[in-house]
Amino acid sequence: MKKYEVYHNAFGDQDVHIANVNIADDVPVMEALEVVFRKTNNIEGSWSKGPTFEVKGETFDNSDYSENVEVVKPLLVKDGVEWGHRSTSVGDYVIVDGTKYNCASVGWEAAA
């Protein structure tokens, strides 16, 4: 497995190492980056929470959970509510094998 380090810095945020996504070594990098994007987006749950999560006392299955995602930055708890991380967006980046790839409007671009 190859480790893809995900950093959020879009929207003027400070660079934050938010997660690592582990993907099989034989997956081409550009294809793997698309997997990283999907696995760090909130579509039907919260990618940064476990296999289930609770909202107002009700437990839900988390379709966005993946055992291949390691959340690096702890989740925010405010007023007793645990908030998941935001989705990966344009301006965020991933580092793999020492190369930085910026999340672009469409796809990924290797940093110069």
Segments (PLM) and residue ranges:
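Acidic, low-complexity intrinsically disordered regions
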Residues: I43, D79, C103-A104
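N-terminal non-globular leader segments, chiefly Sec-dependent signal peptides
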Residues: M1-K73
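Short, compact, well-ordered microdomains
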Residues: G84-A112
